[in-house]
Amino acid sequence: MARLVALDKVRNIGIMAHIDAGKTTTTERILYYTGRLHRMGEVHEGGATMDWMEQEKERGITITSAATTCFWSPNYGNYSGLRHRINIIDTPGHVDFTVEVERSLRVLDGAVALFCAVGGVEPQSETVWRQANKYGVPRIAYVNKMDRTGANFFDTVKAIRERLSANPVPIQIPIGEGEIFAGFVDLIRMKGVIYDKDDGSTYNEVEIPHDLQNEARTWRINMLEAVSEVDETLLEKYLNGEDITEEEIRVVLRKATLNVSIIPVLCGSSFKNKGVQFMLDAVVEYLASPVDVGAVEGHHPRTEETVVREPRDEEPFAGLAFKIATDPFVGKLTFFRVYSGVLHAGSYVLNTVTGKKERIGRVLQMHSNKREDIECVYAGDIAAAVGLKDVRTGDTICDENNPVVLEKMIFPEPVIQIAIEPKTKADSDRLGMSLAKLAEEDPTFKVKTDDETGQTLIAGMGELHLEILVDRLKREFKVEATVGQPQVAYRETIRKAVEFEGKFVRQSGGKGQFGLVNLKVEPLEEGKGYEFVDAVKGGVIPREYIPAVNAGVQQAMKDGVVAGYAMQDIKVTLFDGKYHEVDSSEMAFKIAGSIGFKGAAKKADPVLLEPIMKVEVVTPDEYLGDVMGDLSSRRGHIEGMGQRAGAQFVNAKVPLSAMFGYSTDLRSMTQGRANYSMEFECYREVPRSIAESLQEKRVSKETV
């Protein structure tokens, strides 16, 4: 099957924003106008195509990143009339599902950042913006909900500049705001666009309304100055007072958008069907194709040499698995982005992370949760594979004769955990397998057994995250379970460097056990995790035993020395040791490594850490004092406050342990008129009094 759309006419985009900015509604309108839908679904009716999980329909929020493909030929611009393929990923706005945004942005070439014209830049807008900056994703901004009372396009543009440190450049300004929002002025063509009907497919081009002409001229000059700053030829023409053509503006705007020096800003009301087609034109005009993004770099799995893959069909196949999902009809689905080459259904691929070769059973083009079998998938495309059993999120799949490992994805560790118990024997039999499947899909969901109580603990990014997963256990896997109260996922670390000898000797007749290691443990910067350095010289420990020492240390780190919590941000150097020709074994050195680490950690000033959350509360004026007092009583540190969209906002850093049940308390404190958002910020040392009570709990557990 030949390629239907040239690679330079492919756009892989994400739709990203704060919760309730209108992402899913906007995607529904895109699918309607591009011919993928014949009837539009509404989020508030639970009928949105992209929200296909039961939990999403009930809550009216997007939890997983649904993927779909559509085609669009722009009405205006340098690409007018040329058919383009757009692969869209609709991402969640709730902070508990931040991993879905992270893994989507890793494989996208561009994004539409949605902002609510009333709320402006909200906390999750900042989070997804930082994630997009991390991957250098070009963006256009779409100010949605212009029909809402209190909508203010220019305030939103100002907030993008100030709160996101971005360079927003409006290429449209609205004609009317709130109930009288009627259309926009196109600053490139200097024409007005007035929508006739609510279906948005009919509009009239008009001269710019008289009362907007001065404002339109001012904003056009602003746009011309912005594009002139990034192109010397254009700057010369602008300074000489020469005319700058529409085509020249678009070419330079595209270049500046691709290097993220300019964010073009558009406006609309997706719910009222206004603005979506022009936003699609902008996606094609300004966002990157795989050709613009260029080659990806990886390394050879054995030699570690740099390997470059160009985005061409003729190159060897290389792709990145960015999402695992369980489909009730076809089983395990692996979503992947093709960076180079072509992949045919039925062919074999190598997973360079596990070293295993696997067969691709089927290749599917996904449309939300519907699927369409295709023969093959080309460079630059996004698709789903059936038949890959051992592939995890972030793994590279490639041509077995041309191996490459692409950059892995790094996910945050869970900050909250709950105990879960099956209700019946039948539930007990299914629980382990079901939890394993959920953990396979979601890298921020972890399952472990409490060594002391024998309970199964599940950990995630927030209360809603775990609530959704427990609900999925019941609906998808038919497992009934009771859950305990949420618990904070505390951590432990050390504050000073220490050297220690770990020795394991056992002589009981016959072959004994012997392993001796000298370890240096020292603290790492926050967030660095764990580092093991082999500094052994002169063969005092045979090479085959070194990995066993590392394994023993990592095993010991799971159960900290202060209160039994996992340890982090530690560097361990193995610098000396001894072995016995007959009695030494991998097991002996693993135990010696564990003993050595535990002994060193106890002397290295170990401390307990707790997750600190970044909290923003938006409240009416009259409750501001109560809200601030309450946050302070929760050991919160107020970092800033201000006014936005007619309400007060407070930013604070608060320990997670003090935030359980906060939504209920905030509702009663403000008569339901305030709301808040919360995301993980960092780990900090626990105050002495709390550390002592946690240690006492551990001691009482051990003596029971």
From Swiss-Prot:
GO terms for molecular function: GTP binding; GTPase activity; translation elongation factor activity. Keywords: Cytoplasm, Elongation factor, GTP-binding, Nucleotide-binding, Protein biosynthesis. Pfam families: EFG_C, EFG_III, EFG_IV, GTP_EFTU, GTP_EFTU_D2. One of its GO terms (biological process) is ribosome disassembly. It comes from the Bacteria. It is found in: Cytoplasm. GTP binds at residues 17-24, 90-94, 144-147. Its main location: cytoplasm. InterPro entries: EFG_II (IPR041095), EFG_III (IPR009022), EFG_III/V (IPR035647), EFG_IV (IPR047872), EFG_V (IPR035649), EFG_V-like (IPR000640), EFTu-like_2 (IPR004161), G_TR_CS (IPR031157). GO terms for cellular component: cytoplasm. Residues 8-291 form the tr-type G domain. Belongs to the TRAFAC class translation factor GTPase superfamily. Classic translation factor GTPase family. EF-G/EF-2 subfamily. Catalyzes the GTP-dependent ribosomal translocation step during translation elongation. During this step, the ribosome changes from the pre-translocational (PRE) to the post-translocational (POST) state as the newly formed A-site-bound peptidyl-tRNA and P-site-bound deacylated tRNA move to the P and E sites, respectively. Catalyzes the coordinated movement of the two tRNA molecules, the mRNA and conformational changes in the ribosome. NCBIfam families: EF-G, PRK12740.1-5, small_GTP. This is Elongation factor G. It comes from Chlorobium phaeobacteroides (strain DSM 266 / SMG 266 / 2430).
